[in-house]
A protein has these predicted regions:
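Intrinsically disordered, low-complexity terminal regions
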Residues: 1-11, 16-218
Length: 218
């Protein structure tokens, strides 16, 4: 499978079926937003790099200020909804997911003073590899955030959702119309992300049905 690597800043980018819109020429991002589904993996590194691994034909990728935005499908979404992206960045200030999808951090990250995460209308963010002195996590209308905080954690959940945290921070939490803020067990700090977000089991095969026998004449 061919991938497209986007270096930030960019002058141009176009690589066959895995192409994506280039990020703005002179911007460096500190935050990442995923809108409308997909899978994003973030690793720590000295230079900013964005690589489209799969899909993305109709999924614009752009920068807006210090934000890297992976947008929803353009008007014609046939064959272009799914996207899988790998990102390298020296610092992550904020992650956001809206309308489904997942952003996860992998590998080693240096500790930071602050980090923030938000999920709206479904989705998942995994910040466990990054330990922050102060962290904030916000969920509205479903979703899940995994976060690692040392000193303080501000967690807000409304209309359902789950914030699971590691470390021993002071907690300032608000839950409206359902939701959970809970401490994770130490053995789950390195647990694979797929085990937190299991896929539904396949539907059982339908039993074969024999056609009814026609009654004979008398």
């Amino acid at each position: 499978m061919r991938s497209a690597t986007l270096l930030v800043p960019l002058l141009s980018a176009s690589v066959g079926p895995a192409s994506a819109q280039p990020a703005a020429e002179s911007s460096v991002f500190r935050s990442i937003e995923l809108r409308g589904g997909g899978s994003v993996t973030v690793r720590h590194g000295d230079a900013h790099r964005v690589t489209v691994i799969e899909g993305g034909t109709n999924r614009p990728i752009r920068t807006d200020g210090d934000r890297l935005v992976i947008d929803e499908c353009s008007s014609d979404c046939r064959g272009g909804h799914r996207i899988r992206v790998e990102i390298v960045a020296p610092e992550i200030a904020r992650l956001a997911v809206a309308n489904g999808g997942r952003i996860e951090l992998r590998g080693d990250f240096p500790s930071q003073s602050t980090v923030a995460a938000s999920v709206s209308s479904g989705g998942m963010i995994d910040l466990r590899p990054l330990e922050a002195e102060q962290a904030s996590a916000s969920i509205d209308q479903g979703g899940r955030i995994l976060v690692h905080a040392r000193s303080t954690l501000s967690a807000n959940v409304s209309n359902g959702g789950n914030v699971t945290y590691w470390g021993d921070p002071s907690i300032l939490s608000s839950i409206r119309l359902g939701g959970v803020v809970e401490q994770g067990v130490s053995s789950d700090l390195a647990r694979p992300i797929a085990e937190f977000d299991p896929q539904p089991p396949p539907l059982p095969a339908l039993p074969s049905i024999k056609p009814p026998r026609r009654g004979g004449g008398h």
